[in-house]
Design a protein with these regions (language model features):
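Conserved catalytic-core segment of nucleotide-activated headgroup transferases in glycan assembly
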Residues: 182-242
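Nucleotide-activated donor-binding/catalytic signature segment of Leloir-type glycosyltransferases, i.e.
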Residues: 236-265, 272
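A charged, aromatic-enriched C-terminal amphipathic alpha-helix characteristic of glycosyltransferases
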Residues: 318, 332-379
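Donor nucleotide-sugar binding/catalytic pocket of nucleotide-sugar-dependent glycosyltransferases
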Residues: 138-175, 186
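Short beta-strand->alpha-helix junction loop in the catalytic core
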Residues: 164-175, 193-195, 230, 366
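Acidic donor-binding loop of glycosyltransferase active sites
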Residues: 265-281, 291-294
């Protein structure tokens, strides 16, 4: 779906923004240093407070987020206009977050909550996360989520409608690699550090069998499974190595965590990127793949399919036939081939759309901030 259809409502919000003579909104974001948080903050209208350094942690670590502590809020109430929570709520209990909400209410300062994670990818049990989500959803002055389908789920929890503001590009004006041409179809899956929401073993087992089936049918297809050198589940990593050891056309890469530029180059070399989630809500990886014109193959968890539906091709873990079909469907368009002129043209086309979308996303955030500040002042 093209930008003009997808984001007309955001342009309506942009028209409501007051002139640049109004002081910028001072936002205590949780966290402030996250790439998404930086991307959605209009530098002309929003000033992000730096993440307070928690005691006893390495320099640059923002968690546990100090902004959510009542004592910090009281001590710094004059330094910000609102709190905007994105990530990191697992650092505190639902009861502690209720105290955060109560403190902000007593101070007369608004709370905005973007529901990125209906399920926390860092956790196995979701009970505390759901309870914390309910606390913040009930207490926030405004709720945001990234897709219409996620908004429907948030509405069931909070009994009110969130504002839908889509995930913008995080590349902005950064170079967008086009990938290296190859005479084989290359499918890649990055298992990262095997965090709880990554089904590394199930995904790899299904991929090995799907690649074998496709090659048996004469397809020139290869798969690469990448993991970080340091993983959270060594037993799963060993199983993944074993699954791929004798699998023709499948290789396993182990290495240091890729930085942003290296990750973009790795994805750009693929004809299709496989997402290995067992649970989740929305995916920043799907957004990066969209920017790089790399089709996504994924299980139907959360609301990833709603982010860029025409780029999304689903499969079921344990069903290699469904994965083989998804790979064939995903790699059908000419632009899926890395290093091709069609890929280059598609990347450029999307870059233009995404730059316009980023402006609209930032404007929508500023408009929402102004509304909640005005509502609090009028209360």
């Amino acid at each position: 779906m093209r930008y003009t259809h997808r984001h007309a409502r955001l342009h309506e919000e942009e028209e409501k923004i007051v002139t640049s003579t109004v002081p910028p909104v001072r936002v205590a974001a949780v966290p402030a240093a996250h790439p998404y948080v930086i991307a959605v903050a209009d530098p002309a209208h929003v000033r992000l407070l730096a993440d307070p350094q928690p005691p006893g942690v390495p320099a640059g670590q923002w968690w546990p987020p100090q902004v959510l502590l009542p004592a910090w809020l009281k001590a710094h109430a004059a330094d910000f206009d609102l709190v905007h929570v994105h990530f990191g709520i697992e650092s505190y209990s639902p009861r502690e977050l209720a105290e955060t909400v109560e403190t902000l209410s007593a101070l007369g300062l608004p709370l905005v909550y973007t529901v990125h994670d209906l399920e926390n990818p860092q956790l196995v049990s979701q009970d505390d996360h759901r309870a914390s989500l309910a606390v913040l959803a009930a207490g926030a002055d405004a709720l945001i989520t990234l897709t219409g389908t996620a908004a429907d789920e948030v509405r069931e929890i909070a009994h009110r409608a969130p504002t839908v503001i889509p995930h913008p590009t995080l590349l902005a004006d950064a170079a967008r690699p086009r990938g290296t041409a190859s005479d084989v179809t290359r499918v890649g899956v990055h298992l990262r550090d095997l965090r709880p929401n990554i089904d590394g073993v199930g995904t790899t087992a299904t991929l090995v069998r799907a690649v074998a089936d496709l090659r048996a049918q004469g397809a020139r297809v290869e798969a690469v499974v990448r993991m970080n050198e340091r993983v959270r589940d060594a037993e799963a990593a060993a199983s993944i190595d074993l699954l791929a050891r004798d699998a023709e056309g499948v290789t396993v890469e182990r290495g240091e965590r890729l930085d942003d530029d290296a990750l973009a180059r790795w994805i750009a070399d693929l004809d299709a990127c496989l997402l290995p989630y067992r649970h989740g809500t929305q995916s920043g990886w799907a957004e990066l793949c969209h920017d790089l014109a790399v089709p996504v193959v994924s299980t139907r968890v959360g609301h990833i399919a709603a982010q860029h539906p025409t780029d999304f091709h689903s499969f079921d873990v344990g069903e290699p036939v469904s994965l083989a079909r998804a790979i064939v469907d995903a790699t059908g368009p000419a632009w899926s081939a890395p290093g091709s002129t069609a890929r280059e043209a598609e990347v450029e086309h999307r870059a233009v759309e995404r730059r316009a979308e980023l402006d609209a996303v930032r404007a929508a955030h500023v408009a929402l901030y102004r509304r909640v500040i005005a509502a609090e002042a009028a209360a």
